[in-house]
């Protein structure tokens, strides 16, 4: 089953409709010593622990907006919902390596500008597969690498609208899904702003 990840679910209002079959992507940073959800700096937001108690999703994508918060984040996740599946995204290299050594779940990025070789060298649990321009040819190399190494990686696909392209008026997603089918790639999650559209596409 492919789980749909709601992009920037940074407040309690955004949790409506997120059930056990769904997930959320959030931004975490410190604000006067409190761990809060906020994409931009110097603004207040919902405290992470408060948000966690309301969260009913089965997967959490954590975009760490300040370096070195991983221990605090994991401790709060364990204290509220130790069974919650999660992974860190967009970490700087030193903190990514540190997190992997500690056994934390992390993602490596793959796109036109971030190579498959680099992603596999990082030994992460998840791959965050993106396209900034609409060019998805890196999926071919990803498929070949997975076949060659017989390694099962969890994969999250980034929906085109997260990079500013229009989802509703474009056939990019249909072409993308056809390419995924031809390559026999298996995606575990899709991060999107428009879960209802993807629900129909994945039927």
Report each predicted region and the residues it spans.
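Phosphate-group recognition and catalysis centered on beta-loop-alpha active-site segments
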Residues: 1-203
């Amino acid at each position: 089953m492919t789980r749909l990840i709601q992009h920037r679910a940074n407040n309690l209002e955004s949790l409506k409709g997120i059930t056990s079959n769904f997930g959320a992507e959030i931004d975490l940073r410190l604000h006067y010593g409190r761990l809060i959800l906020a994409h931009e700096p110097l603004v207040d937001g919902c405290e992470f622990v408060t948000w966690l108690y309301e969260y009913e999703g089965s997967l959490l994508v954590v975009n760490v907006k300040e370096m070195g918060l991983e221990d605090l984040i994991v401790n709060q996740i364990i204290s509220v919902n130790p069974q919650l599946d999660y992974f860190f995204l967009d970490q700087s290299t030193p903190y990514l390596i540190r997190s992997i050594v500690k056994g934390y779940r992390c993602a490596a990025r793959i796109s036109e500008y971030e190579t498959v070789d680099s992603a596999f060298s990082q030994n992460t649990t998840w791959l965050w597969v993106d396209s900034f321009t609409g060019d998805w040819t890196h999926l071919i190399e990803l498929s070949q690498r997975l076949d060659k190494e017989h390694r099962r990686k969890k994969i999250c696909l980034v929906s085109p609208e997260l990079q500013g392209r229009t989802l509703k008026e474009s056939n990019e997603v249909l072409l993308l899904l056809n390419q995924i089918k031809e390559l026999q790639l298996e995606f575990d999650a899709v991060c999107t702003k428009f879960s209802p559209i993807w629900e129909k596409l994945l039927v």
